Amino acid sequence: MAEEVREEAQAGGGKKKLIFLLLLLILLAGAGAGAYFFLFAKKEEKKEEKAPKVAPPEVGIMYKLDPPFIVNLADPEATVYARISITLEVANQQVLQEVQKKEPVIRDAIIEIISSKTSNEIRTPEGREQLKLEVLKRINTILSEGGVRNVYFTEFVIQVE
């Protein structure tokens, strides 16, 4: 009977050692993982900081073509009007002066482009973007050296009668 008690005590001590070793192993694994993330996460953050910051593009001079354009569209089945306010972004003061000097020619070209479109062609975002590109290209062909960077529609209304 005394031998049985000793065997049970030794078996119980073995379980305690096993639990202690497992806890120690988990603790070491946690410490190792923490050290890894602490050391290597800092290096990744430093790499991101070293990446060159891209400066936002510089905005040019804005020029509003006033009054707004009120144009009949090319819809065959109904009378459709478009009211569009346009602002131009120009590269520099010289281009601005040329735009101001040639504004009647520019306005005529824009009216010609808009009046050739149907309401279905310019009703969608893609259609409006295409219209902007056409206007931009036409204006830059009118100017001696181009220089209009972008065309902005600040008002865009289509009305069907």
From Swiss-Prot:
It is found in: Cell membrane. The gene is fliL. Keywords: Cell membrane, Chemotaxis, Flagellar rotation, Membrane, Transmembrane, Transmembrane helix. The chain crosses the membrane at residues 18-38. PANTHER family: FLAGELLAR PROTEIN FLIL. Controls the rotational direction of flagella during chemotaxis. The keyword Iron-sulfur does not apply. GO terms for cellular component: bacterial-type flagellum basal body; plasma membrane. This is Flagellar protein FliL. The keyword Transmembrane applies. Pfam families: FliL. Belongs to the FliL family. GO terms for biological process: bacterial-type flagellum-dependent swarming motility; chemotaxis.
